[in-house]
Amino acid sequence: MKTEILTLLRETDGYVSGQELCEKFGVSRTAVWKAINQLKEAGYEIEAVQNKGYRLVSVPDILSESELQSARKTRWIGEKIAFFDVVDSTNTRAKQLAEEGAPNGTYVIAERQDAGKGRRGRGFDSPAGQGIWMTLVLKPEIDPNHASMITLVTALAVSKAITDMTGRPAGIKWPNDIIMSGKKVCGILTEMSAQFDYVNHIVVGIGINVQNKSFPKDIESVATSLFIETKEHYHRAELVELIWEAFEHYYEIFLQTEDLSGLVNEYNSHLVNMHQQVKVLDPKEPFEGKAMGITPKGELIVDTWESRKLVSTGEVSVRGIYGYV
């Protein structure tokens, strides 16, 4: 009931009377009073005025299931939310839930990860209260060979959401990093369980530095946060909702064709590598060239002095000639 009351208070501009809450949820005034007090204890500022009722004044920056559900506007993402104060890795937990039958659109979110996962087995620093660490479960009926494009769909959604929230450009470093001022603010890790021609499930992990004021010496030259970039604090649950709204939109476009043909132009407009000299760290043979955008299959187009090459996602990294981007 706490979540339902919070949702109603969010949706109402003025006051909601105690009687209205009792009638709507079929509970006593004492039960309403207890739920309101629980919300206040969690950090919600709720004004109570005699003969008027209750009004939500402000919300805290917390990632509870009640907060996330009450802010939810998506159609199918987040019907089931698994919130944890601490997990080893949201990707690991999401895979477990997927294998146990969690429905499409379920997501795992945590205040802290003890063993966050990055690309190619790297760790991902995930301190409590500082960022958004979450993983979405997808169960699409697509060719497993097309699954890697979902990473690019996710990057586009995160780029748009951060740009919309902060008013600052958040670009994409192909294929899976979000960049502000030349530094990484978000990483994306997509993992799949599949048969030869069938996807069991896909999990899409997103890690965003939001409130961080500083970083360890070994990554401070390449990492940033929304706070560092704007000197403002952001309500993380609101950003989560913006990301999932954008993702639903872009993902459904992707599913229509199982490629990025409907998203290429928008993706390229967010691509920080676009028309930049890049170094492709291909294990077989590294090379340099100019990035010219992506193909409908999500490959990075790189023009070298002798030919045009198409770079696929996977074990290949792309760096700027003079730095990370």
Regions found by a protein language model. Name each.
Residues 49, 127, 173, 294-295:
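A short, compositionally biased micro-patch
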Residues 177:
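Conserved active-site carboxylates
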